[in-house]
Amino acid sequence: MKKFLVTLLAFAFCGISAANEDLRIADSCYTARAEHAVGDKANAKNAKLMIDSYRKAMNDASVEERATEGYVRSLFFAFRFVHFEKHQRKAKLDSLKTISETAYQKFPKNREIAHVYASALSMWGNERGALTSVKEGVATRVRDVAIMAEDYQVLGRAHFVLPYVPLVLSWPDKKLADKYLSLALEKNPRDLYNYYFLAELRLDQKRYADALNLIDRGLSRGVRTNFFLEDKRGRWHLKELQKQINAKLDKK
């Protein structure tokens, strides 16, 4: 009996060690996600290993939440930065939305999971069309998840992008968009998209000098080595918005 228990414990330990090894591999792949990229497209083999390893690590209850967070985060990264054919987009977005929703239901207090879910749900709703998204309650769900997670970037974008529709969608408010996007930048000045989204709002407000100032501030931050692809694309968006504003000013 004693020998049996020792053997059983040994197998259990091996299982936990294997799962934790999967987590270690996955984290290493995530850290190296920009290596061997072509342009702003990540290496597909590394991304697949990262996703598969996080999924395997989820079997270890002791690291399940951390592994689940890594899993949905890596799926979101792959959707944004790994090349796939255009006809695959709908299936991949459907999968990202479903998986992140399940993860959010299990770990509703995890802010990283909530951010991915709100972002995926927002993109999913946008693909279905604004009216359908509103009727099915997708827009309100995005807002509610963002509020719970204090995700000011997603919340501010929702207030800015979504149309005010009396009796149907009465909560979008561009004054609140200003409040939340400003908060997002204040709380995380390292994320270039916080400069970009607030600059877009300033453009909409015809505050061109303020928009250009935000763009300059964002571009001056350079590129973070641990967010290389994300910041590289963020800089591209900032420069494109800068061109758009300058072209508008040149016409005056």
Functional labels for PLM-detected ranges:
Residues 4-13:
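Sec-dependent N-terminal signal peptides
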Residues 200, 207, 216-252:
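A cross-kingdom marker for long, charged
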Residues 28-52, 73-109, 116-147, 155-186, ...:
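Short coil/linker segments at helix-helix boundaries
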Residues 65-67, 113, 151, 194, ...:
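TPR alpha-solenoid repeat register
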Residues 61-64, 109, 190:
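Short helix-capping/linker turns of helical repeat alpha-solenoids
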Residues 70-71, 116, 154, 197, ...:
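Canonical tetratricopeptide repeat
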Residues 17-21:
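Boundary at the C-terminal end of the N-terminal hydrophobic targeting segment
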